[in-house]
Each structure stands twice: as structure tokens, then as C-alpha cells.
A protein has these predicted regions:
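Bacterial N-terminal signal peptides
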Residues: 8-18
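Low-complexity, Ser/Thr/Pro/Gly-enriched N-terminal "stalk/linker" regions
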Residues: 26-46, 51, 232, 250-319, ...
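Short Pro-Gly-centered flexible turn/kink motifs
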Residues: 229-254
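Extended, well-ordered alpha-helical scaffold segments
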Residues: 255-291, 341-359, 403-423, 465-482, ...
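Carbohydrate-binding/catalytic loop surfaces
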Residues: 297-319, 365-386, 431-452, 489-514
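Well-ordered alpha-helical scaffold segments within catalytic/enzyme domains
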Residues: 327-343, 389-407, 452-466, 507-523
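Alpha-solenoid helical repeat scaffolds
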Residues: 405, 410, 419-431, 436-451, ...
Length: 542
């Protein structure tokens, strides 16, 4: 309960902050529509906004178009709600778009597209969307957790955003992934993004989707731009709605916080109704502990790495932490098995702990964190994340066993040895190297995975009553505060890429949260504040 109360306190320390005024004048708006006849190149028509009455505009091209376009703007609570309605005078394939000038100098700006783009994505490689490739990007809305783009201007301490308002209940297949493509039916998906126009940032949005200057088709693979065209039949109409708002923000972290709160208030997500109870889902999920158990290798494990979804057949990969999480799964199986009187789950979990104690360590005392048994391969490069997650799992196991009046002195000795090795690995600035070898030589010095070590260090300080571990944990958060949280630069927690990373923000928030649990007064409030600041970045991915 104390855990829940602190979490709620962290999330509710600051009330929801309203958006400021956003008054985009007609001269700050540029609109265009592209029309395509299948088999021919599309033609783009710039549109002039002709005022019909207050807040109502007719969008006109320099030549007669086969559709009418009406743009309505409603000011409400300092925000502008824009609704564009197209009515076809004959069958037409269209792509409509707008741009709004922010007035911000593009070279000053940082950008936020929830779950996809943070600041300038400069930690991402040039093979992925980032400023390395272009300073202007348009993307499909369904790449984002919310169909929104925000530009933050540190010079003025302001941020402007545009969000799409729709039901998002339609999608259509296409035969091509690049170039001008015809949709096979109706879609709900438009596009959003930002562009550098003569050194000034503009927010760009439209419908249906397009992506430019590249489309991201799979990991580290950029393809040529794509632009979709949807059929609007003669006599039919379609309406699209966006909302533009502006807000003050002291830094990029506050921009993310306030924009996420605005997204939440705008979208008002609600719990998903489901006929399944928690107990029923636990029962179903516990089948993983049965089906994936491998008991004929030197260390027993649950198979979940490199899984082929077509067969779900067990593989030869035993992994501590990250995807495999064999030791934490064993603890979960043990605890659940005891609760449900499932002796099979309890026995298998204990076999995993026993075999890892006997055969699961490197010569230097670190976990053999990845073993390919059929291939006869053991990963010799250790990661602070997998090692930490293994220690975290064993500390949970030891604490549980202690409550059952059972002792495991050999495990305690092993874990203390690993934790003492952690203290040797820790850098003067509080960080831990991302990857290292048995001889403590560094493979990857990046400190982004540091918060994964904070959790077991805090737990160990309580379990072993050793203040050294708590001091080390506090030093990790000194590093996190200086290099990640204060800079809004969450990176490299995941093991397969050293880039902007939701797990890094989640781990940073959790690390600060753990320290808030074991401290008091102003120190506790400070850690809780750091946890809240990092938590908004983690939340923004969802």
C-alpha cells in the first residue's frame, strides 16, 4: 500500500495545466490539396482562404476543382479547433494538407511526437528518422501514441502543438509502400509532423497519410516517401478535425509533461471492458511456465527468446533478464504456484534457482546471462541491465524465502559477491558501463543503462543492511539527474540499440522512486520529483 500511495503522490504532485492561447491568423496558414487520377502523377493545388463569415473560410485554387472545401475555425479555451470539410462534385482521389507557422526559429526548436520523436532524435542513427537525415519530417499518425506534433522553443519558453481529433476506426490496404499510392478503401489515418520553411518551424498535418522525406519501413531501413490518396465519390463529404494550442514550458521536460496532460484530457482514454478476470488471466498466463520449461540443460530455464510464433517451440536460448527473464519468471512461478497449490510450478521454479546456483555463473562470478545450448555458445560480454535484473530477481526470491523461514546462504554469498563487483564497476560520476567483460574491461561505456542497477542496490541495502549499496544507489541517481533527467535525454537502456528509449525513462523513474521509498523528508521529496519528471516521458510512449 505504501508503494501505491507514493506512486499516486508522484503522479498528482502537480495539477493538470491548461493550454495557452493559440491564435493562428489566416496569413500564417498555408493549405493545399493534391488530386490524382489513377495511372497519372498527382497534381498539387495551393489553396487560398477566402473568408465567408467569422471563422468560416472557402478554400479556393487558381482553377476550378472537382470538389468544394470549407474550413471552419472555432476558438475555445485558448485553443483553435479546425474542421475541414471536402464535398466531391465528381469522383476524386485526394490528399489534403495544411501548414501553420509557429514563428519559432527552426534551429532553436526541439520536437515532440509521442512515442516516436523526442527533441531532434539525434541519438537515433541516420538509418532511422532523425535530424541526421533531415530537419523536416512528416509521418503517419499511427506511428505515434497520440496523433500530435509539438514544437518547443527554448528561447521563448513556449510550445505549439497540433492534434488530430477523430474516431480512428478505419484502415485500408495498399499495393505499394512508397510513392503515390491509391487506398483500397477508407482510412482514418492522416499525417503529422514539422518542417523547416525558410528557417521557421511550421507544423504540418493532413489527410490521408503521407511520409516524407522518407518512410520508415523496418528497423534501420528508410525508404522513399509515400503519399496516400483516398477516393471521395461524387456527392459524398468527408470532414477532418485538428486542434492547435500553445502553452508555456520552462524546458523540454515540462513541454512533454504539459503536452501529455493535454493529450490525456483531449482523448479521455477509458478502461477497456473485458470479460476476463484477473484471476482467469493469471491462470492462462501461468501456462507459459509449463509449456516453456526446459529441464534437460545445465541450467533449467523458461524458453521465450527467438521464439517462432508459428510453432511456439522451445529454443536453446537461456537468458537472464531482458527478454528471457528466466530468474524473475521463476520467482513469479514460485509465488503463484504456492498461492494456487500448483506443485509443478513450484518444483520447476526451484529447479531453475538450484541449477543457476550451481552452473549459472562466469569465472568472475557474474551471471552467464545468455547461453545458446545447442550452439555451445555463452555470451562473454556482460550487460549491467541483465546482470542487475538477475540480481533483482534473486533478491525477490531470497526475501520471499526468508519470509517462509528458509535460508539460502550460498545464494546470499553469490549475490553479495556480484554486488561488490558492481561497486568496482561504478564510475566516479555514478554511472555504470552498459557492457563489460569478466575482467572488468569495458565494451560499451555508455551510462544510459545505469538505472537498472539502482533497483537491486536499494533492495540489497535493506536485505543485507549494508549502507554501501544505498550510497551506490544514490550515486547512480546523481548521474541520472545530471545526465538524463535534467537534460530530458533518456537513452540506451535497451540492449539492441543505443538511442532514444522509453525503457530508459521508465527505469530512471523507477530508480528515483525506489530511493524515495527508503529516504525521508526533503531527500524523499527530491527523489519523488525526479521520478515524476521521468515518468512523464515513460507515459508519453503510451
Amino acid at each position: 500500500m505504501r508503494l501505491k500511495r507514493l506512486f499516486l503522490g508522484v503522479m498528482l504532485l502537480v495539477g493538470i495545466t491548461g493550454a495557452g492561447a493559440a491564435n493562428a491568423a489566416p496569413e500564417d496558414i498555408s493549405a493545399s490539396i493534391s488530386l490524382k487520377v489513377p495511372g497519372n502523377d498527382a497534381k498539387q493545388y495551393p489553396l487560398a482562404l477566402q473568408k465567408m463569415q467569422d471563422g468560416m473560410y472557402s478554400c479556393r485554387a487558381s482553377e476550378t476543382l472537382p470538389l468544394d472545401i470549407i474550413r471552419q475555425v472555432v476558438d475555445k479555451d485558448g485553443k483553435q479547433r479546425i474542421t475541414v470539410t471536402l464535398k466531391a462534385l465528381e469522383n476524386v482521389y485526394f490528399n489534403y494538407g495544411e501548414q501553420i507557422k509557429t514563428g519559432y526559429k527552426h534551429s532553436d526548436c526541439q520536437f515532440y511526437m509521442p512515442g516516436f520523436w523526442y527533441r531532434r532524435n539525434l541519438r537515433s542513427p541516420k538509418e532511422a528518422p532523425s535530424f541526421h537525415t533531415s530537419d523536416s519530417w512528416l509521418v503517419r499518425e499511427d506511428r505515434l501514441s497520440t496523433p500530435l506534433t509539438a514544437a518547443f522553443n527554448p528561447a521563448s519558453g513556449t510550445s505549439m502543438s497540433v492534434i488530430r481529433i477523430d474516431k480512428f476506426d478505419k484502415e485500408a490496404l495498399t499495393t505499394h509502400k512508397e510513392g503515390e499510392i491509391i487506398l483500397s478503401g477508407e482510412t482514418s489515418i492522416g499525417y503529422t509532423g514539422f518542417c523547416n520553411v525558410d528557417g521557421v518551424t511550421v507544423l504540418a498535418y493532413g489527410f490521408p497519410y503521407k511520409e516524407a522525406p522518407k518512410t520508415y519501413i523496418r528497423k534501420l531501413t528508410l525508404a522513399p516517401a509515400v503519399e496516400a490518396f483516398q477516393l471521395l465519390r461524387k456527392g459524398d463529404s468527408i470532414s477532418m478535425t485538428w486542434e492547435v494550442s500553445e502553452r508555456n514550458a520552462a524546458d523540454f521536460s515540462e513541454c512533454v509533461q504539459r503536452t501529455w496532460e493535454y493529450c490525456y484530457d483531449t482523448n479521455r482514454p477509458k478502461p477497456v471492458d473485458t470479460p476476463y478476470t484477473v484471476d482467469r488471466m493469471k491462470e492462462v498466463m501461468s501456462n507459459f511456465f509449463v509449456e516453456s520449461y526446459v529441464g534437460n540443460t545445465p541450467t533449467h530455464y523458461y524458453s521465450g527468446v527467438e521464439l517462432e510464433t508459428a510453432t511456439c517451440a522451445n529454443t536453446d536460448v537461456a537468458e537472464v533478464g531482458f527478454v528471457g527473464r528466466t530468474l524473475l519468471n521463476a520467482f513469479n512461478a514460485l509465488e503463484y504456484g504456492k498461492q494456487q497449490n500448483r506443485q509443478d510450478l513450484v518444483d520447476n521454479a526451484n529447479h531453475i534457482f538450484d541449477t543457476y546456483l550451481q552452473n549459472g555463473f562466469s569465472p568472475a562470478g557474474f551471471f552467464n546471462e545468455v547461453v545458446h545450448y545447442n550452439r555451445g555458445f555463452k555470451e562473454t560480454r556482460h550487460s549491467i541491465r541483465r546482470q542487475s535484473e538477475g540480481v533483482y530477481a534473486i533478491l525477490n526470491y531470497l526475501n520471499y524465502e526468508k519470509q517462509q523461514k528458509r535460508k539460502h546462504p550460498e545464494w546470499e554469498k553469490r549475490i553479495k559477491g556480484m554486488l561488490d563487483s558492481f561497486l568496482k564497476l561504478q564510475n566516479e560520476d555514478g554511472s555504470f558501463p552498459r557492457k563489460f567483460k569478466d575482467d572488468f574491461s569495458i565494451v560499451d561505456a555508455s551510462g544510459g543503462s545505469t538505472p537498472s542497477a539502482t533497483l537491486p542496490l536499494v533492495m540489497a541495502s535493506k536485505y543485507f543492511k549494508d549502507k554501501r549499496y544505498l550510497a551506490s544507489a544514490k550515486h547512480t541517481v546523481d548521474y541520472l539527474e545530471k545526465e538524463l533527467i535534467s537534460k530530458a535525454d533518456y537513452f540506451s537502456s535497451t540492449l539492441d540499440a543505443n538511442c532514444e528509449d522509453k525503457e530508459a525513462s521508465l527505469y530512471a523513474a523507477t530508480a528515483a522512486y525506489y530511493l524515495a521509498l527508503v529516504t525521508k523528508g526533503e531527500e524523499r521529496a527530491h527523489y519523488a520529483g525526479l521520478a515524476k519528471k521521468a515518468a512523464y516521458f515513460a507515459l508519453s510512449w503510451y
